[in-house]
Amino acid sequence: MTDESSVRTPKALPDGVSQATVGVRGGMLRSGFEETAEAMYLTSGYVYGSAAVAEKSFAGELDHYVYSRYGNPTVSVFEERLRLIEGAPAAFATASGMAAVFTSLGALLGAGDRLVAARSLFGSCFVVCSEILPRWGVQTVFVDGDDLSQWERALSVPTQAVFFETPSNPMQSLVDIAAVTELAHAAGAKVVLDNVFATPLLQQGFPLGVDVVVYSGTKHIDGQGRVLGGAILGDREYIDGPVQKLMRHTGPAMSAFNAWVLLKGLETLAIRVQHSNASAQRIAEFLNGHPSVRWVRYPYLPSHPQYDLAKRQMSGGGTVVTFALDCPEDVAKQRAFEVLDKMRLIDISNNLGDAKSLVTHPATTTHRAMGPEGRAAIGLGDGVVRISVGLEDTDDLIADIDRALS
C-alpha cells in the first residue's frame, strides 16, 4: 500500500492550455494514495510533531495548516484552481458570495473612508453599501454605473474603493471596466468587480485593470444548486494581508465539503457556461420579438443600449435574460406572477447559474430589500422578470416561456 503521509504535487500544466482544461486539472494535489479525484479533508484541526512546531506554525514560520477556519487542504485546491482560471495572483475562499463581497470591501475600508458604487446591484450588495458600511463610518456614493460622467464626478475627489457588478443583477446594465478603473486609480481607489453574471469564462477583470474580483460560488461555479460558497481574488499582499486577517478573526470560512463540491463544479464550468450562454442568446432573441414583452435586457442583443461595450469586454452575453412584460404598471405584479406560475419546466427560484433553468420576480425577491425608491432608481418595475438559463433543451425552454406568456 502506498504511504498516504506524503502529498504529490501534480505535473505543471503545459503553457497556453484553455480555461476549460484548467478547470479540470488546475491546482490538483494528490496524497500518497494517488487518488484521481481530489481528497476531501474533513477536519477542523491539525496535529504537530512537537510544541515547537506548533509555535512556529502559528507564528507563520512554517507552511503548516493550523485550523480549518484559517485554511484547509481541500479549500486550498479550490482556491488555486479558481485563481488559475481567473488569471489572478491569489485567491481566498469564503462561506458565501456575500461573505466575499463584505470581506473584500471590509479589507479596504474603515471609518472616514469613501466608497463609490454602482447603483444597480444585487439587493444584499446594495444593503451592504447603503446601510452596513455606513455604520462603520464609511461614506457611500452611488452612481448610475452605465453613465461615465457620473463616475468622473464621483471620482474627482480622493476615494478608497469602487464597487460594481457588470452585467448588473438583474437589469443587465454594464460598467466600462477599463474606463472606470482608470478614473478610480487616479482617485486613489481600489476597484472591486463582482463578476458573478459573466463568470471568468466570459469576462476577466484583471487584464482591464481591476484590483479585486469577487464571486458567489453558489451560482455558476457550483452549477447545480448544492452548496454555498464565495471567493475573493486579488494581489498576494491584499489576500495574505487584510483579507486573511479579517477572514481569520471573523470566521466566514468555506468548509472542506463545500470546497470539494465546488471543485467538481469547476470541472464542468466551461462546458455548462458555453451551453447556457448559447441558449440564453436564443431565448433573448425570441423574447425580443414577442408581443407580450416590452423590452429585453441581454448584453449580446443589438438592442441592448451598451451592446458595443458588451462586445468589447465580454466574450458572450451570459446565462441570464431579463425582460419586462408589456402591461400597465398597476397590474404588472399580478401579470408577472401569472407568467411565473404558468411555467411548467422552469422553476421559480431566486438562485441563478444552475443546471436547471430558474425564474424569479426580482422586485418581490432578490431586490425586495432595496425598497420601492431604490428599485425605481434602477428601472426595476413590477413587470420585470429574470430567467437564469440552464442546461435543458433550448427549444423546450422557449416553448415553456411562450406558453407562459400566452
From Swiss-Prot:
Top-rank taxon: Bacteria
The reaction(s) this protein catalyses: O-succinyl-L-homoserine + hydrogen sulfide = L-homocysteine + succinate
Manner of cofactor binding, per the entry note: Binds 1 pyridoxal phosphate per subunit.
Biological role: Catalyzes the formation of L-homocysteine from O-succinyl-L-homoserine (OSHS) and hydrogen sulfide.
Pfam families per the UniProt record, alphabetical: Cys_Met_Meta_PP
Keyword match Amino-acid biosynthesis: yes
Pathway membership: Amino-acid biosynthesis; L-methionine biosynthesis via de novo pathway; L-homocysteine from O-succinyl-L-homoserine: step 1/1
Subunit structure: Homotetramer.
Cofactor: pyridoxal 5'-phosphate
GO terms classed as biological process: 'de novo' L-methionine biosynthetic process; homocysteine biosynthetic process; transsulfuration
Ranges that cross the membrane: none
Family: Belongs to the trans-sulfuration enzymes family. MetZ subfamily.
Phylogenetic classification of the source organism: Bacteria, Bacillati, Actinomycetota, Actinomycetes, Mycobacteriales
Keywords: Amino-acid biosynthesis, Methionine biosynthesis, Pyridoxal phosphate, Transferase
Top-level EC class as recorded in UniProt: transferase
Name the UniProt record assigns to this protein: O-succinylhomoserine sulfhydrylase
GO molecular function terms listed in the Swiss-Prot or TrEMBL record: carbon-sulfur lyase activity; pyridoxal phosphate binding; transferase activity, transferring alkyl or aryl (other than methyl) groups
InterPro entries: Cys/Met-Metab_PyrdxlP-dep_enz (IPR000277), O-succ-hSer_sulfhydrylase (IPR006234), PyrdxlP-dep_Trfase (IPR015424), PyrdxlP-dep_Trfase_major (IPR015421), PyrdxlP-dep_Trfase_small (IPR015422)
Origin species: Mycobacterium tuberculosis (strain ATCC 25618 / H37Rv)
EC number from the UniProt entry: 2.5.1.-
Key word Nucleotide-binding present: no
GO cellular component, one term: cytoplasm
Residues with N6-(pyridoxal phosphate)lysine modification: 219
